[in-house]
Amino acid sequence: MTDAPAERPDPSVAGDADWAAQARPLLVHADMRLRKRFDQGEPIERLVALRARAVDQLMRNAWTRCIPADSGLSLHAVGGYGRGELFPRSDVDVLVLGDSVAQQRHEQHLSRLFALLWDVGLPISHAVRSPTQCMVAAADQTVLTALIESRALVADAAARAALAAAIAPQRVWPPRDFFQAKREELLARHQRFGDTADNLEPDIKDGPGGLRDLQTLGCMALRAFGVKDVEALVGLGHVGCDEAAALRREREELARLRFGLHIVANRPEERLRFDYQKTLAERLGFADDLESLGVEKMMQRFYRSAALIRRISDRLLQRFEEQFDGEATPESLGGGFSLRRGYLAADSDSWPGDDVLQVFALFVHWAAHREVRGLHSLTARALAEVLREFPAYDVADATARELFMALLRGTRAVETLNRMARLGVLGQWIPAFASVSGRMQFDLFHVYTVDQHTLMVLRNIALFAAGRADERFSIAHEVWPRLRKPELLLLAGLFHDIAKGRGGDHSELGAVDTRAFCLAHRLSEGDTELVTWLVEQHLRMSVTAQKQDISDPEVIHRFATLVGTRERLDYLYLLTCADIAGTSPKLWNAWKDRLLADLYFAARRALREGVEHPPPREERLREARESARALMQAQGHDDATIDRQFAGMPDENFLRFRPEQLAWQAASLIEVEIAQTLVKARRAVPDNDALEVFVYSPDRDGLFAAIVATLDRKGYGIHRARVLDAPHDAIFDVFEVLPRDTYADGDPQRLAATLRQVLAGDLQQVRPARRAVPGQLRHFRFAPRVEFSESADGRRTRISLVAPDRPGLLADVAHVLRVQHLRVHDARIATFGERAEDQFQITDEHDRPLSESARQALRDALCACLDPV
């Protein structure tokens, strides 16, 4: 940088291009040196300071070249640059200070300066203001925030004093008002990110617990106490040495992530997007092992840093508030605790000492008083100081374990567990929970870290306990009152994923942990067995419902036999609903709700009638016809009409659908003659987006593929498809769909009309839409897997397809099946984040299972169509 010449100002721009051409490689070379030092592990605090210093020199040389010495103007770095920090792709924020006369006189000089800096490659963001204009602009606290961190680059003492006077607390934003504004800004910013840092692609600068939170604390400290950083508050008694050290350590951690992110993205990127996560993890030295991917280790460290920053920040914000508003008179709650300005505080300065029971007493009082705003900062710090000495449950005494179980049985148990988790107590009590805290899974299926997912599951259980009907969970409020001990479901929810990341089957490993915990807390053998079984089998109901044919009595028999009792079924159903809904906001839908409810009722009936003696096929057919007949009679249809419609429906239909579906199908068939096409659509559940589409048609080549392609083009995702052969060479197609894209309006009549129009034309002309793969999905590609087996009766071939999910996937598969002249009889569609796991039952065009050569040809065609490479 020192080689960039500092010439006398010249009103012409002659030579500026040469000057920029000399300066540009110097800046690039300086950045390359910093990158090398970054890779060698040099502290980020030094690297960002060195980059700011290099830019300082270039700025001063450019200023000297373009601005006359007697201009009356001064140059100041503001914002992050003002703090003396510049990350590789950060904006360079500057203020030119001068009165209006100087601004007008040197307007061309300033334009030349900024153009020159842009030519060099600096992303300059500038403001030109007089001191009075600075005072007016500082009415916006974001402007003031940038100005109070200013640093003179080319300025005399008078200019520095003028700027300081313009933004002095006596003129704009007194400290208390500034604190309130910054706190409101921080809370609003957190809300934009869902009030959590545990997102798949977190923002390490602006997200909760990010660098911006630390900068906000620094600005508050500067405005209120006149100190340059939070560490300086230690001497004033507002921050503990341990807190200051923790903030400094976590700031270095996040700053290293941000510095590396700017390098790998080669742009001012602040979000840890999937595009960069793996590359950044490798650059930072996080390696894969048998238990975790390197990227998962990196993200876990980030989430833990963000959580600790939030925890300490909450305490400091409260102390700043107390500094301005003063301490209120304590309101005694008894038991050694009081309310101070709405915050729960321990009365004793030595709390909790070495008494574990006092920590549990804190949470007991917190749960007992809904008016509590939170934990008092001094009590929170006292808790943090003794946290490392807080015992795990397996070495704690029996009284402490009894207190924990009492909290779990309390009316606000889930709130209490959330508080214990946020403050680090739950991870101390259950070390296995600490191990999964901040642990992410590098996929699109799990959108929360393991600990946050666990807490989401517990919140869903709390919703069931509220006793109010929730449209998302149609029967949960009916099942909940049957639970003998609700705390057992909470324990199962707490432990169901606790063994993630250890290698092996997390359900089996988690069951071992669960049993040890239950026995240590003196649960009965029966209760221990129930909770352990729930953890070990917590995926069973979800897998059965989504990957198997639950209209098949053999599937129901196997599932009911595994469950064994109505009590286990009730607990497992609620745990499954809470688990799926707590995995991703988009994962739970009306279709999954109905699917699990259907499995629950089918299993309950099997348990009631006895799993040893499942009803024979003829009995099931008779019951289904009788139930559907009763519904149609209630609608005014006579027996002759009902018999005629039933005769046109395949027997298999009565075994696959519920009575109300059968009645709807049969009533719809009244409108159509043999060899005609009928398309009907309706809402599968009232006041919900799920649609049921019924197509009755003469069997035609390409019918299934045309329907699937049309549904895809109209923005609907298919979750289940049933294709049955009906009398008179007709086909029964039933699809359960949900709007997938924003342009799918969810109108069943409009969708049915579109399908009628398509099916009235040439089906061979209907092709799948070509779609681009969304950016996120591109980072989770893998080779598709196609497996074949025979159906139980040997009449059909089963295909199990696992492939990277993408828009139009099923339409492409259906097109391949049509080209291969294959007939689809059943399809079950399941998507788990970036993975599509679909199953089909097919035959060749002569209704025979596929030969080995046909299987290989189909496998080759599907892989060629779906392979992401």
Curated annotation (Swiss-Prot):
SUPFAM superfamilies given in the database record: ACT-like, HD-domain/PDEase-like, Nucleotidyltransferase, Nucleotidyltransferase substrate binding subunit/domain
Disulfide bridges in this chain: none
MF terms in GO: [protein-PII] uridylyltransferase activity; phosphoric diester hydrolase activity
Positions of region (Uridylyltransferase): 1-332
Keyword Lipoprotein belongs to the record: no
Domain of life: Bacteria
Uridylyl-removing, as annotated region: 333-691
Record keywords: Hydrolase, Magnesium, Multifunctional enzyme, Nucleotidyltransferase, Repeat, Transferase
Annotated ranges, domain HD: 450-572
InterPro entries: ACT-like_dom_sf, ACT_dom, HD/PDEase_dom, HD_domain, NT_sf, PII_UdlTrfase/GS_AdlTrfase, Polymerase_NTP_transf_dom, UTase/UR
Cofactor names: Mg(2+)
Record GO biological process: regulation of nitrogen utilization
EC number(s) from the headed UniProt entry: 2.7.7.59, 3.1.4.-
Catalytic activity, as annotated: [protein-PII]-L-tyrosine + UTP = [protein-PII]-uridylyl-L-tyrosine + diphosphate; [protein-PII]-uridylyl-L-tyrosine + H2O = [protein-PII]-L-tyrosine + UMP + H(+)
Activity control mechanisms: Uridylyltransferase (UTase) activity is inhibited by glutamine, while glutamine activates uridylyl-removing (UR) activity.
All residue ranges annotated as the ACT domain in the record: 692-774, 798-869
Functional note: Modifies, by uridylylation and deuridylylation, the PII regulatory proteins (GlnB and homologs), in response to the nitrogen status of the cell that GlnD senses through the glutamine level. Under low glutamine levels, catalyzes the conversion of the PII proteins and UTP to PII-UMP and PPi, while under higher glutamine levels, GlnD hydrolyzes PII-UMP to PII and UMP (deuridylylation). Thus, controls uridylylation state and activity of the PII proteins, and plays an important role in the regulation of nitrogen assimilation and metabolism.
NCBIfam families from the UniProt entry: PRK04374.1 (NF003347), UTase_glnD (TIGR01693)
Comment block on domains: Has four distinct domains: an N-terminal nucleotidyltransferase (NT) domain responsible for UTase activity, a central HD domain that encodes UR activity, and two C-terminal ACT domains that seem to have a role in glutamine sensing.
Family: Belongs to the GlnD family.
Protein name listed in UniProt: Bifunctional uridylyltransferase/uridylyl-removing enzyme
Taxonomic lineage: Bacteria, Pseudomonadati, Pseudomonadota, Gammaproteobacteria, Lysobacterales
